[in-house]
Amino acid sequence: MEKRIFTEEMVETEVKHQPKQEFSNADIQLDEEPKAVKAELIIEESLKPSRFWLRLFLAALALFGIATIAQSVQWLIDTWQANQWIYFAFAVAFFGISLAGVGAIINEWRKLRWLRKHHYHQQVSQQLLLETADTSGEKAREFCKSVVKNLAQTPMVQQVEQRWQSQLDEAYNSKEVLYLFSENVLSPIDNQVKKLISKNAAENAIIVAVSPLALVDILMVAWRNIALVNKITKAYGMELGYISRLKLFRMVMTNMVFAGATEIASDVGLDFFSQNLTARLSVRAAQGIGMGLLTARLGIKAMEFCRPVVFQQNERPKLSVVRQELIGVLKEQMFSKSREEFEFFHNN
């Protein structure tokens, strides 16, 4: 073997290694939320009907209403002149029903316009948040005042509005004004809605985990979810009709489906499945957690649609918090039930 001689120059050219770097979980940030939001917007735009066909349908509906009113008036005149009192009574009833129907259509149209105005306010708030720091906050102030008018004028809302106005300064830009508005005015409402969502999610989870009848579970949970969305809309001062409520449900459910809520529920169910419980108890508890998470997801999406100002960074409710609450509630409920059954059989 040939002998090798190392010189000082060769030693200096050795590779220098950098010290080891350690990263904590807090330093890792996932970029999934913007992608999910972008996907939801694309889906929502693709599912919107054509403006031409919508206007054509509304025009045909208005023409039908006018024709119905005109026909009922003509029927009233003809039966009155012919002294046909029985037919006249039917004509009066038909005229009243026609007026009620046209009034209901006008009321639904007005509430649909209100829902569209609400979404326009959300877009305006998004634009105000994207403005540069050197812009004036006067436009944001006027926007926030218009939002307060649509909220339910409770003593709490009036108190937090006064506190918000007392903290304003002429030097604040739009983003700072909206931040103060969210912290002072909308934050108490957000907390109430979050408690409402957590309560309904936990109750639905217990219903599914304890009840042995699947059909009854589905019907009861569906009814409770509809009531939950109605309570959320009232909390933010939204007045919805039948059609506008259906439209809101369609948007919420569409975003829920494409956001992969069922995948989240199954993952959490599998995590809980590994707990030291019996197989039967774990399956029922996992089903309850899955349904509770779907309820929480529905409530959070409805909250995002109903909130007049879009959520800023770190304001969006986290599904993981609801998950931990659900696991704790179900553990306590299922363990207490198992303990009662054991004591019952032991005493007998």
Curated annotation (Swiss-Prot):
It is found in: Cell inner membrane. It is a multi-pass membrane protein. Its main location: membrane. This is UPF0283 membrane protein HAPS_0079. Keywords: Cell inner membrane, Cell membrane, Membrane, Transmembrane, Transmembrane helix. The chain crosses the membrane at residues 57-77, 86-106, 203-223. It comes from the Bacteria. It comes from Glaesserella parasuis serovar 5 (strain SH0165). Belongs to the UPF0283 family. It holds the Pfam family DUF697. One of its GO terms (cellular component) is plasma membrane.
